[in-house]
Amino acid sequence: AVASEGFKNKTDKSGKPYILHCIRVMQNLHTQDEELMSIAILHDCVEDKVCTIQELVAWGFSQRVIIAVGLLTHDQAVPYQEYIKNLSWNYDAVKVKLSDLRDNSNITRLKGLTKSDFDRMEKYHIAYTYLSKI
């Protein structure tokens, strides 16, 4: 409910409802682990200002979920590769980030490809390669 309500008016780069990205990230984990599924659904919520870590605590999410969502929240003041390294110690964050990177790298989701899209794909590829070796 947190993610679906928070992202109800947000669309992705192709104009589709943003919540579908979160659902695909969850589905692509191929798991029945409800906490891992929650992490996947919530992975962009704090970063995109849908909610705060404190609210997740108040709503009763487990420490496992809160820690992983916190690690998956990219503070823009932190360089991207440092952010990736910082989350790499947490199994749940790595699993969800790999699924997120796979979904974000799917160029069929984009309306058209620009130079910035190719640059972003290169950044994602470097992160995916690093995390997949963990």
Residue positions per predicted region:
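Active-site helical microenvironments for divalent-metal-assisted chemistry
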Residues: A1-I134
